[in-house]
Amino acid sequence: MRVLGIETSCDETGIAIFDDQKGILSHQLYSQVKLHADYGGVVPELASRDHVRKTIPLIQAALQEAGLDKDGIDGIAYTAGPGLVGAILVGATIGRSLAMAWNKPAIAVHHMEGHLLAPMLEERAPEFPFVALLVSGGHSMLVRVDGIGSYQLLGESIDDAAGEAFDKTAKLMGLDYPGGPLLSRLAEKGTTGRFHFPRPMTDRPGLDMSFSGLKTFAANTIAANGDDEQTRADIARAFEDAVVDTLAIKCRRALKETGLKRLVVAGGVSANRHLRAQLAELMESLKGKVFYPRTEYCTDNGAMIAYAGMQRLKAGVFEPLAVKAVPRWPLDTLDPV
């Protein structure tokens, strides 16, 4: 069985084909980074228009890469939310239209479920149950996962997501868009301990997170200490240390509360090397295991959507004729399969 996956929830157009016996047969990805760079962030209208231009050519390229035509596809999965509603509608409309034209089932996929399941594409895949840390530009949450669709929200960011805080702080430091990865690179040149940022919400019980205050703290630190290259690197290091420490503390608590020994980390920020190293140390100390998707599946992509869609299609879960697009969609409202 093969599923075509379509991802257009923000500023990446991702198309992939997943085979339940052979794995990923094709993977096409187009990033809009250059399009949005001059604006310092994603412009929703421009994102939607670019998805219109790129989605169908990438579908054609994915089919060609896999050596398939429409008869070789058993279902079409598309991101139905959460995300930018205009961008979502592009992929959802194309996916639903192709499903109708090709007489195939269409599967509406939750974007964050796609991220959560991305490590399942690896040879070393996690077994249920596990705790998932989902960290991206739009979301930061801890979830207990007992099976596909069986999700319990343990905690989430009450303001900025971790990735959003990275990008906003990078912008304050004059780094180009998208600034998060550039800030991390700058932090590698920094000295630990010169500056100390708070670890938000770690001095109280609970698993919710907050990162917006770190951006303000960074702005004040920059204003008070100048912006020579080494100072900027030291501030970047202090900021990254604060975010990573906070996430690690919350993961430790979540694992303790649930009694689980497996941790899945997914989403764009999961590619951060400092975060990976610290969580590896954490899980070693707990005699547990940590799982990640490969780097190319950390950011938005069609492979995770194709995989998630396959699991729901196998369970007989697919959409009626209507196009589904949900800009706000709590992960823990999904039905288990």
Curated annotation (Swiss-Prot):
Transmembrane intervals: none
GO-annotated biological processes: tRNA threonylcarbamoyladenosine modification
Binding site for Fe cation: 111, 115, 300
Name the UniProt record assigns to this protein: tRNA N6-adenosine threonylcarbamoyltransferase
Gene Ontology molecular function terms on file: iron ion binding; N(6)-L-threonylcarbamoyladenine synthase activity
CC terms in the record's Gene Ontology section: cytoplasm
Entry's cofactor comment: Binds 1 Fe(2+) ion per subunit.
Binding of substrate, residues: 134-138, 167, 180, 272
NCBIfam families from the UniProt entry: gcp_kae1 (TIGR00329), T6A_TsaD_YgjD (TIGR03723)
Catalytic activity: L-threonylcarbamoyladenylate + adenosine(37) in tRNA = N(6)-L-threonylcarbamoyladenosine(37) in tRNA + AMP + H(+)
EC id: 2.3.1.234
Named cofactor requirement(s): Fe(2+)
Keywords on record: Acyltransferase, Cytoplasm, Iron, Metal-binding, Transferase, tRNA processing
Pfam families: TsaD
PROSITE patterns per the UniProt record, alphabetical: GLYCOPROTEASE
Native organism: Aeromonas salmonicida (strain A449)
Function recorded in the entry: Required for the formation of a threonylcarbamoyl group on adenosine at position 37 (t(6)A37) in tRNAs that read codons beginning with adenine. Is involved in the transfer of the threonylcarbamoyl moiety of threonylcarbamoyl-AMP (TC-AMP) to the N6 group of A37, together with TsaE and TsaB. TsaD likely plays a direct catalytic role in this reaction.
Family recorded in the similarity comment: Belongs to the KAE1 / TsaD family.
Localization: Cytoplasm
